[in-house]
């Protein structure tokens, strides 16, 4: 889009106009080319330095990572059993079959497998069914059984603040000679605390359940000790570009289309050593380092110059856009780094930003100050659900372990594959002095064609309102943190309207409808909770502290929440168990009863139909764990395992239980939103219900708004 000078002076009004907003809804991405005379000067502190992320492109494809994830975990399992290590795939009659794909297909069909099912798989892979069955039984079968018996396993969490290496199961730091260190993660476990317990140090490699099952965690490496200036990073980019052109393009110049083809070939490669660097999410706070746009506090800037003042105050200056006229972020009472305060992105050839949506499904504005093209891909919001389903279906095991995977910005899938599955994908080539706008709940991704300098912020238009509420509901089950209180934003819209401020009537009506439903729900929850606990009125205080989030679901605690008070000991909180877990010295008889009556015990009982397979599995894995050689190499391995713990031997400390589903809290109190407390019906609740605002006050606001709308 090429807005006129007049249109360009009102960004939210322009982007909300029927013509442009319909394009945003249809395509998801809109590129804005400013009027020819709009050219803000670039201002950044000469001392500006930044960290970079190291990105291995072949690690980012969702299919490749799923296969790698499975191979790593099953190979640990096989190593404990002294079995051969697997590659990613095996060949049958010249056809490549991936082990993970075979595992998933068997899981989808469900065990027990019969001849008909194997024939169906053979037809699907285009190979003999007998070859698939033989390979599955010899390599995957027992690992699949292990995963089934541990499908509800909750990983014990290590406390990074612990001074010593304590057993992750019981929390004690004692018996170092009877403590194993996992050969992958180095976490310590008492042999007696394992299930089943071990009597001898294993002769082979030993891995904890967490490393056998896998967490699905992935993140970019970052060298925290290395920072680049812009000239240093530019020189590094030039050197990398020259080498890349020589190695991968026969010294011929690269077009954007060439780079695009090569980018996706690296992403889809099974393994590539190509590593690129990206200065992403840079949020320095010193004056002159927050943004490339001129700001009132930019050092050495002549703020009396009318031309400078023009750009400092222009609504397309990304420091101004989030709170420009018409942006709904004016109704939140705080600044948010990366959302209302710009973050800087300094790209290099092939550096990438993976598929994601913006926080709270807001709109984003990205501006390129200078440099090479940034290639964008976008998925219209109408297809967001279909996209999410495709990603989950492509990597069910990763999503099971990382429910918020799509919010981690570490996963890619080729646009061509999306189109194959009926998901439209659009693109934009962003160049210097151009903006790219992403509309609400538009998944987007892309890569850089070379060195460039961009920055981005978020804002919200009236059409965003329902998307914002949906984001809160979508975040709860995956425990993604809220960035601001959506319902406080609605409250502020109604309050400003009642105070005779100029607020769109349509926006007020939609806000009122949503807010009234929310208050009605709070009233229902309050009725359930007030008889179970004491009620305290505690007026809310404006802050943007993490303390405003529910300790369970990470949703904003809102206008009422539940405080779990300490009672004789620290209380530990979980949405899946009683809201109060008291730390006491365990009684062995009581512990035995708990185990006997636990969900795990019932789950085990349900596996009786497959008892023969499980028994065989247990026998084999126990043999691998307990088989101790008497030769010198075994003594060396045993010494290696316990050496670090022997050096750290300290006086015994009080017991600290690390129970399943328990969230560790430094503070004595824990906060739960009322939505998380109410499902605990019938369970003992020790604590108090805190009202930040009386429901009567919220109802009065609703009634006043209705009267003013008449």
Task: Identify the residue ranges that each predicted region occupies.
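Short polybasic/polar patches that bind polyanions
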Residues: 79, 123, 419
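Conserved N-terminal structural segment that caps and organizes enzyme catalytic cores in eukaryotes
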Residues: 1-54, 153-171, 177, 191-197, ...
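Extended, structured, electrostatic nucleic-acid-contact surfaces
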Residues: 179-183
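Chromatin/DNA-recognition segments of nuclear transcriptional regulators
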Residues: 88-109, 113-158, 209, 428, ...
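Surface-exposed polar/charged interaction patches
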Residues: 80, 109, 146, 623, ...
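Acidic, Ser/Thr-rich intrinsically disordered and amphipathic helical segments
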Residues: 69, 73-76, 98-101, 116-120, ...
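Structural motif
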Residues: 434, 439-442
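Eukaryotic low-complexity, charged/polar intrinsically disordered regions
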Residues: 1-105, 120, 132, 139-150, ...
């Amino acid at each position: 889009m090429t807005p006129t000078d007049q249109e360009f002076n009102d960004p939210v009004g322009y982007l909300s106009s029927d013509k442009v907003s319909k394009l945003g809804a249809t395509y998801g991405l809109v590129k804005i080319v400013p009027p020819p005379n709009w050219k803000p000067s670039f201002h950044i502190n000469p001392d500006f330095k930044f960290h970079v992320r190291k990105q291995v492109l072949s690690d980012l494809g969702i299919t490749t990572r799923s296969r790698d994830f499975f191979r790593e975990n099953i190979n640990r399992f096989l190593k404990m059993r002294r079995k051969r290590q697997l590659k990613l795939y095996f060949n049958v009659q010249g056809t490549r079959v991936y082990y993970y794909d075979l595992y998933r297909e068997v899981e989808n069909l469900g065990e027990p497998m019969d001849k008909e099912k194997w024939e169906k798989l053979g037809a699907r892979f285009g190979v003999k069914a007998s070859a698939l069955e033989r390979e599955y039984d010899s390599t995957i079968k027992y690992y699949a059984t292990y995963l089934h018996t541990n499908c509800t396993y909750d990983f014990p969490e290590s406390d990074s603040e612990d001074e010593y290496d304590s057993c992750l199961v019981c929390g004690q730091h004692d018996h170092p000679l009877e403590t194993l260190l996992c050969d992958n993660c180095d976490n310590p476990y008492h042999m007696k605390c394992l299930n089943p317990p071990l009597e001898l140090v294993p002769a082979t490699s030993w891995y904890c359940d967490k490393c056998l099952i896998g967490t699905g965690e992935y993140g970019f490496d970052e060298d925290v000790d290395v920072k680049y200036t812009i000239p240093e990073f530019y020189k590094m980019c030039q050197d990398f570009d020259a080498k890349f052109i020589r190695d991968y393009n026969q010294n011929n110049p690269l077009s954007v289309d060439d780079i695009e083809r090569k980018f996706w070939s690296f992403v889809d490669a099974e393994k590539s050593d190509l590593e690129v660097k990206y200065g992403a999410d840079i949020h320095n706070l010193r004056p002159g380092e927050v943004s490339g746009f001129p700001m009132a506090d930019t050092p050495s800037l002549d703020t009396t110059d009318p031309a400078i003042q023009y750009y400092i105050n222009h609504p397309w200056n990304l420091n101004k856009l989030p709170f420009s006229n018409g942006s709904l972020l004016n109704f939140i009472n705080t600044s948010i780094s990366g959302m209302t305060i710009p973050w800087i992105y300094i790209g290099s050839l092939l550096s990438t930003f993976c598929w994601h949506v913006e926080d709270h499904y807001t709109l984003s504005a990205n501006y390129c100050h200078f440099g090479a093209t940034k290639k964008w891909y976008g998925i219209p919001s109408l297809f967001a659900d279909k996209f999410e389903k495709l990603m989950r279906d492509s990597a069910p095991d990763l999503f099971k372990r990382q429910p918020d995977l799509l919010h981690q910005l570490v996963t890619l899938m080729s646009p061509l594959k999306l189109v194959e599955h009926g998901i439209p994908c659009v693109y934009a080539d962003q160049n210097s002095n151009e903006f790219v706008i992403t509309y609400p709940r538009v998944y987007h991704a892309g890569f850089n064609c070379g060195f460039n300098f961009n920055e981005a912020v978020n804002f919200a238009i009236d059409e965003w309102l329902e998307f914002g509420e949906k984001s809160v509901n979508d975040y709860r089950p995956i425990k993604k943190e809220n960035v601001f209180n959506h319902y406080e934003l609605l409250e502020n819209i109604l309050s400003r309207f009642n105070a005779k401020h100029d607020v769109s009537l349509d926006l007020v009506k939609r806000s009122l409808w949503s807010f009234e439903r929310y208050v009605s729900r709070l009233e229902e929850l309050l009725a359930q909770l007030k008889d179970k606990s004491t009620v305290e009125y505690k007026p809310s205080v404006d802050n943007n502290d993490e303390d405003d989030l529910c300790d369970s679901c990470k949703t904003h605690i809102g206008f009422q929440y539940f405080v779990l008070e300490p009672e004789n000991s620290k209380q530990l909180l979980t949405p899946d168990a009683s809201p109060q877990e008291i730390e006491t010295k365990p009684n062995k008889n009581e512990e035995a009863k708990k185990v006997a009556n636990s969900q795990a015990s019932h789950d085990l009982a349900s596996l009786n139909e497959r008892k023969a397979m499980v028994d065989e599995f247990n026998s084999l894995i126990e043999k691998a764990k307990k088989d101790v050689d008497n030769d010198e190499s075994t003594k060396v391995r045993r010494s290696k395992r316990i050496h670090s713990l022997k050096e750290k031997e300290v006086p015994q400390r009080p017991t600290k239980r690390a129970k399943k589903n328990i969230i560790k809290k430094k503070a004595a109190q824990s906060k739960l939103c009322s939505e998380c407390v109410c499902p605990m019906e019938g369970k003992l609740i020790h604590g108090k219900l805190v009202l930040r605002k009386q429901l009567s006050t919220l109802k009065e606001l609703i009634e006043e708004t209705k009267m003013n709308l008449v």
